[in-house]
Amino acid sequence: MTTKDTNGALRCSFCGKGQKEVKKLIAGPGVYICDECIDLCNDIIDEEKERETAVKGTFKVPKPSDIKTYLDDYVIGQTQAKKTLAVAVHNHYKRVNAMSGGKKSADVEMQKSNILLIGPTGSGKTLLAQTIAKVLNVPFAMADATTLTEAGYVGEDVENVVLNLLQASDYDVEKAQKGVIYVDEIDKISRKSENPSITRDVSGEGVQQALLKILEGTVANLPPKGGRKHPQQEFIQVDTTNILFIVGGAFVGLDKIIEQRTTNKTMGIAADIRTSEEVEKSANLLSKVEPDDLSKFGLIPEFIGRLPAIAVLAPLDEEALLDILVRPKNAITKQYQKLFSFEGVELKFTEKALRAVAQMALKRKTGARGLRGVLETAMLDVMYDIPSKNNVKEVVIDENVINEGAQPMLVYKTDEEIRAEEEEAKKKSSA
């Protein structure tokens, strides 16, 4: 490509753009390259480096303490669950690094440590899984176990879970093969009875059977655009051996199974006295969960065996919900304050208002998930009105707004403040 046009103006030797069409044109021996082509080259090199790193498995694995510290920034409480998760994730990706680049150990075969999260709705299961993917900078996909069925039946194929991860990786197979998949509502696919079923259970035990292979590690043949498979189409092959699977559920009633096991150890009158005097809370009982309890709940033994790391999340109390409102980096109140700041308005919450939000969410029994719903309802009118008003500088939410649906207090700008803003706007437009 020529480096000059008919008028003698210099051009990029690669894309052909003139020097007036680009910000910079850098000269070399007989050639020129523009800033846009340099950026493109850097992007290509960076992508290639990332791909090589993914293939070699040389990415740095954070220490368990570092993973927990990162989780602390986004998830309130659940200390024991965070530790369990941090150790399991650290060991999983150490194993991934060891298996990559021909480092397989001849004498010791390291198996996968997929993770089971047990906890009530809104206790932070999904957020923990999402945050783990963020700290590791790996692709993340989420699926709902209740929508899954065995292949060939109406519903979503189990392999579509892996397809979601591939799509989240922009169809980069190497990236996808080191990603994280979270399957929610796993307790809803428990089999109907503790004994093996003689009839077809396509959305319960059948889904557990179908999940076994991808949990342990298999090569999944995925249709590029999703949907049902047909013989004529080409498939993308994804190896699930190094994908970390985190599954979670509320497991309502599991505490009763554990209580029955732990209290039946003593027989006769003493057992009744002990049961009435020392009944433990649901969260404490769940922390004593054993594989046999999960089997009685309805998970098949083979499925339980693929989930060696179990983390139990406690229900959130009022104080924990209060912390969730204000403490995390992405706290809900901070998100709303950011939204209001786009309109030049400062949003404030009184201490009593925050407590009222926590109490209302607690009554709804939806955990942290209920906090946003309470605030959305309480602030609907003010969020509707504020963009149409240019003279409001502050909005104060008190407990009456939350409990009684009262209007929040609005603080208006003075005439001097409005004039100063108008003058500042004129200066910016003239500049």
Swiss-Prot record:
An annotated GO BP: cell division
Record bears the keyword Chaperone: yes
Binding site for ATP: 120-127
Disulfide bonds: none
Record domain ClpX-type ZB: where: 1-53
Binding site for Zn(2+): 12, 15, 34, 37
GO MF annotation list: ATP binding; ATP hydrolysis activity; ATP-dependent protein folding chaperone; protein dimerization activity; unfolded protein binding; zinc ion binding
GO cellular component, one term: HslUV protease complex
Keyword Nucleotide-binding: yes
Record's keyword terms, sorted: ATP-binding, Chaperone, Metal-binding, Nucleotide-binding, Zinc
Subunit details: Component of the ClpX-ClpP complex. Forms a hexameric ring that, in the presence of ATP, binds to fourteen ClpP subunits assembled into a disk-like structure with a central cavity, resembling the structure of eukaryotic proteasomes.
HAMAP family per the UniProt record, alphabetical: ClpX
Function: ATP-dependent specificity component of the Clp protease. It directs the protease to specific substrates. Can perform chaperone functions in the absence of ClpP.
Protein name (Swiss-Prot/TrEMBL): ATP-dependent Clp protease ATP-binding subunit ClpX
